[in-house]
Regions:
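Active-site acidic carboxylates
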Residues: 2-127
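Structural recognition of alpha->loop->beta junctions
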Residues: 46, 117-132, 193-221
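Solvent-exposed loop/turn segments at secondary-structure junctions
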Residues: 56-57, 99-103, 138-139, 162-165, ...
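Glycine-centered short loops/turns at secondary-structure junctions
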Residues: 90-91, 152, 178
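Internal catalytic-core helix/loop-beta-alpha segment
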Residues: 115-161
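A short glycine-rich beta-strand->turn/loop micro-motif centered on a GG-aromatic cluster
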Residues: 157-161, 179-193
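Short Gly/Thr/Asp-enriched flexible loops that form oxyanion-binding sites at enzyme active sites
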Residues: 167-175
């Protein structure tokens, strides 16, 4: 009997180890910055607005992180105004969503699994296009490259969350491809203000520009 119990414990420990090991590998892959192909030099380059990870499972009714929940109303109001401004100027709006298809990761937490309510866009978010990019990080999905090239985009305006994670990896991947990046600073949130400040300072040193949401209409083309 003791031997059976011992084997049960060993098997359970191995299962837990495999699950959490898989989760760590998944998170590491999600944070990896893709290289991509440098963009073409478009004669009349255009802009696009990226809305990153504003979803039911991050800012909506299924959200778990208190910092995101507290910031969500203000964030979504700002982003919706930016979406309106972009639409008025025929600037493409692209919605980037995190979703998890890894079966083992979903055994631990399936709140953002593919097709789940948590993976859907936050219902408060204004949707004006059918440009949806499911991803672990935005440029990990080649659809984003295709949309930007088809629309001759060479400048990206960034909104959403989290400054220290998906927003950061998306910006880094965009820089690798030669895009000009402008972060709309008051329309990006993070788990902590200190993390946001730290990431923004590092990105400034790489040539990323920052502006307030009120400056967006005058700057966009």
């Amino acid at each position: 009997m003791k031997r059976i119990l011992l084997w049960v414990v060993i098997v359970l420990v191995l299962i837990v180890a495999v699950l959490f090991g898989n989760l760590m590998l998944f998170e590491r892959a999600a944070e990896r910055v893709s290289e991509g192909v440098p963009i073409a030099s478009f004669a009349a380059g255009k802009s696009a607005l990226l809305v990153i990870d504003i979803q039911e499972g991050t800012t909506g009714k299924l959200a778990l992180k208190e910092s995101y929940i507290k910031a969500s109303d203000s964030l979504i109001r700002l982003v919706n105004r930016l979406v309106d401004s972009a639409s008025e100027r025929n600037v493409p709006v692209i919605y980037v969503r995190s979703e998890v298809s890894n079966v083992l990761v979903n055994l631990i937490n399936n709140s953002m699994s593919t097709g789940s309510e948590g993976a859907a866009l936050d219902k408060r978010l204004k949707v004006v296009s059918d440009f949806y990019i499911p991803k672990q990080n935005a440029f990990s999905n080649p659809i984003l490259d295709s949309i930007l090239i088809a629309n001759q985009v060479n400048k990206l305006y960034i909104t959403g969350l989290d400054a220290g994670f998906c927003v950061n990896s998306t910006i880094e991947a965009a820089l690798n491809r030669g895009y000009a990046i402008t972060v709309i600073s008051n329309a990006v949130i993070s788990e902590t203000d200190s993390l946001k400040v730290q990431v923004f300072e590092r990105l400034k040193a790489k040539g990323v520009t920052f502006l307030n949401s009120g400056e967006f209409p005058a700057s966009v083309n």
